[in-house]
């Protein structure tokens, strides 16, 4: 049976909650905050490939790490439509 592992990081000056969901060396980040280096180090040390980033909203404290993460992992970023 496959197991999902959910890890919580509290990141940045706003103490943003970031969640990493892991399964079979693949992972998804939810609201990666502004600490790309910390997240990249964790992913590397745990032999995880980042397959997607999900954003609950576009505030600065939730999206600061996106450029570095997308550049390194070439993964899609998902966010709701603007109305």
Predicted segments with their positions:
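Conserved beta-strand hairpin/beta-sheet module of binuclear metal-dependent hydrolase folds
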Residues: 1-46
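Active-site HxH/HxHxD metal-binding segment of metal-dependent hydrolases
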Residues: 35-83
